[in-house]
């Protein structure tokens, strides 16, 4: 059974799993589900229509499930869905979705770290194993794919997409889509090479990393336009997950991808 501090406010119809801990002055509304082993620390707030997985921790001052900051919201029932093993640090905020977006739900995957004062707006989708560093804000309907990291105080424009395994430096303005597997920084946001360290940590081989680098050299450093670059990649590289992820991401980009800096990426692959 759940362990609820007598000074916490928990609606009797809220569904709390086994061994859930709720600290003093935490506030949990009626239409909330919290998975086994999760901890809701003092002064955390969880509003209606939130479903949280197992072994999550919500730190003091965090607010989950507040209505979206969207003028199109008309009081409809929308949701926040959070996976397992998610850490939501001090004063982070996650808003519900809106039906006007066509989504109606804000999603956080498994094994995600939202550091202090991060903001996840309505209808965003944050994938598995992502890190949003302190003071990051992602606007409505932003998609952050698996294993992406966004550096502190960076902000993402509405409808942006950040590719898997991408690493974005601190203090950046994200107003274009960030392709998978890359490093980027500066203002305006600029391609700065392949995320070699991150890919190694996740078990990518030297050959895989080299192929990724060679593909981005064609995209950013060869003078090709995007369509020609993708055609050369499709015809010049054997089929692989990495090749297909890069091609599909760029072809489906609605905002266009970030610019290149006109020089080779740094770092040793071997």
Residue ranges of predicted features:
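Structural signal for interior beta-strand "rungs" in well-ordered beta-sheet cores
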Residues: 3-185, 189-190
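Terminal amphipathic alpha-helical/low-complexity segments used for targeting or macromolecular assembly
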Residues: 1-7, 12-13, 18-19, 55, ...
């Amino acid at each position: 059974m759940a362990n609820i501090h007598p000074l916490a406010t928990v609606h009797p119809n809220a569904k709390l799993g086994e061994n859930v801990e709720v600290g003093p002055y935490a506030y949990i509304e009626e239409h909330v589900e919290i998975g086994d082993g999760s901890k809701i620390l003092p002064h955390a707030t969880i509003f209606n229509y939130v479903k949280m997985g197992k072994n999550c921790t919500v730190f003091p001052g965090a607010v989950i499930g507040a209505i979206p900051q969207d003028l199109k919201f008309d009081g409809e029932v929308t949701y926040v869905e959070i996976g397992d093993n998610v850490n939501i640090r001090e004063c982070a905020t996650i808003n519900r979705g809106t039906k006007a977006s066509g989504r109606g739900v804000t999603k956080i995957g498994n094994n995600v770290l939202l550091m202090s004062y991060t903001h996840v707006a309505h209808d965003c989708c944050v994938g598995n194993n992502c890190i949003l560093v302190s003071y990051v804000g992602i606007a409505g309907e932003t998609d952050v794919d698996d294993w992406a990291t966004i550096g502190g105080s960076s902000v993402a424009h509405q409808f942006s997409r950040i590719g898997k395994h991408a690493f974005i430096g601190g203090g950046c303005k994200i107003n274009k889509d960030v392709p998978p597997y890359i490093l980027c920084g500066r203002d305006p946001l600029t391609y700065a090479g392949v995320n070699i360290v991150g890919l190694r940590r996740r078990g990518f081989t030297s050959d895989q990393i080299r192929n990724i680098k060679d593909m981005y050299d064609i995209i950013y450093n060869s003078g090709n336009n995007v369509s020609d670059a993708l055609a050369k990649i499709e015809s010049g590289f054997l089929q692989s997950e990495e090749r297909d992820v890069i091609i599909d991401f760029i072809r489906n980009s609605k905002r266009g991808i970030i610019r290149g800096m006109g020089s080779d990426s740094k770092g040793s692959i071997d």
